[in-house]
Amino acid sequence: MPRDYSRSQSPVSNPTGDRNYRDRSDRPKRKDRDVSEDAPHHAYRKKIKIPKKEHPYPSVNELKKRIRDVKRLLNRVDLPADARIVQERALAGYENDLEEEMQRRHRSAMIKKYHFVRFLDRKTATKDVKRLERREQEVSKSDLDAVAKEKKLAALSQKLDIARVNLNYTIYYPLTEKYIALYAAVKKNKDGTTDGAADDSDVDAGYKLVHATREEKPAMWHVVEKCMKDGTLELLREGKLDTPDVDSTGKGSQKSKIDKHAQSKTDQTKSKSKKSEYKDTKHATKGKGRSVTSAASDENGDESDGGFFEM
């Protein structure tokens, strides 16, 4: 006969002395916390929200979106006059901000692009100026004839003037324009000598001037020379100075305009000649195809006619 298990015979209902059962009416015990009411709460780690960095410059996409929204609003016919005036002013402000931001980005990109080239040119030009100044002091203190000393000092002063213009060229060249280097690295031969290396008094070792004479200098070099006399180098560097005549004589700008005009004309003539050649070849191929098909049809027709008459 099976044993009769009942609730009264369970070990929970009849606890023994060996096992202690917790009363469920008590608060649960926790090992990591103090259950007393007066105990201070433990400091838990809270997620620290880092505030977003506010960019000092506006977003280009945001400005473009605002411009589109304002233009869409201005296209409405039922827009009141006062609201239209406000939106037109806002549109002008947004467009101005967008233009300034694009110019700032272009400026920073050009600075980053030509930073290293300008640094090398400035370093070489500084060494040239210091070397020539030291040479000038040595010649002035030397025991030479008055005539020979005067000739050497005059030649050194001319070289020193050019070297100072070169240095200012590397420093005050407009930051928003493409930089044209003044110095180039000298290639070394297998025996260690350099090809076409100039005198040590003129250029730094390992570098030489790309443009030997004043006439061969870039157009901006003459602008820098002029700004040195006028005292407007800072304006030139920041691009706030209008430089319509690139050369001191004004030939540079006219020449560049003429070159651009001639280049555009040559491009137009080339494109026209290409189009005409393409048309001629197209017509020729069409004519050839027609002649071939007509010849084939004539041959087929002769054969068929001959066969018909033979019959």
Swiss-Prot record:
Q: Return the protein name.
A: rRNA-processing protein efg1
The entry's localization annotation reads: Nucleus, Nucleolus
The main location is: nucleus
Please list every transmembrane segment annotated in the UniProt record, as residue ranges. Answer: none
Pfam families for this protein: Efg1
Signal sequence interval, chain numbering? none
- Record function comment: Involved in rRNA processing.
